[in-house]
Structure formats: structure tokens, C-alpha cells
Amino acid sequence: MILKIKIKEISMLLCLLFYCSISSANEIFLSLKKSKVNVRYGPSFDSDVKYVYKKINLPIKQIDKKENFRRIIDLKNNSGWIHVSQLIRSNSVIATNDKILFKKPTSFAIPIALIKKGRLLIVQKCEKNWCEIKTDYFNGWIKTDDLWGLTN
């Protein structure tokens, strides 16, 4: 009897570990499609507006979904529900620390600019641990560490 209980407990633990590893590997980042996006308390147009984002391309993380709404969380841990028509696949990130933008994807390349913490960046493409990005004024390469919104 004790052996059956232990086997059952172990198998439940393995299932839980397997599920957690799958869910963390499948993080979904999206970006805001419009310059004004309502975030609601619930997954319905009948739900009250909790707050309004006013930043196009802002990256957000999807943590749940229900029909045509996605529950999201942002870099500052604000959360709520957004309709799918206001979201696009993520092509943007936010620098979580000051970073150097390089001309080529190597630390030995010519530095182009200092990217300040909190800066919104548009990702062109990624190779290994580097992403080619553009800002309002610069194009170049940046290391992928300390970027929020990047899918692995």
C-alpha cells in the first residue's frame, strides 16, 4: 500500500515538473498594435477599462487566454485583458539595463550608441546571443541579455 502511494506521488511530481518546464519554455511575448490600447479587468468588452497603454509596439507577456482576449503582464507587473485585435507578434523589447549598441554582432565592433534602461527597441533579427535592432536614430547590434520581451 505504501509503495503504491509513493509511486503515485512520484508520478504526480514528475507530471508537474514536466508541465512547468513546458510552460516556461513557451513564453509568449506580444506587442501593442496601436498607440492607444485599453486594458480591461476581465476578458470581455463589457468589463471596465483598468488602464490605457499609450505606446505603440510596447512588449507585453501573455499569461492566459480566453476566446478573443489575452491576459497580459508588462515589465512593471501591471496585468489585465486585451482584445487580440490590439496585439501583434512581438517585434519589440525593452532594455532592462543600460546597453551598448554595436555596428556588428561582436563586442569588438565599433560602439554606435548607449541604449538607456527602459528604452523601447524594435528587433530586426536575432543571431545567437545578439539582436539587430533599430531605434528612432540608430540601427545596430545589441547583446540579448537584459532585454525584456525577447522570445527564446
Map each language-model feature to its residues.
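Second-shell loop/turn segments in exported
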Residues: 44-47
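SH3-family beta-barrel domains
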Residues: 23-41, 51-56, 63-104, 108-137, ...
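Bacterial N-terminal signal peptides that target proteins for export
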Residues: 2-11
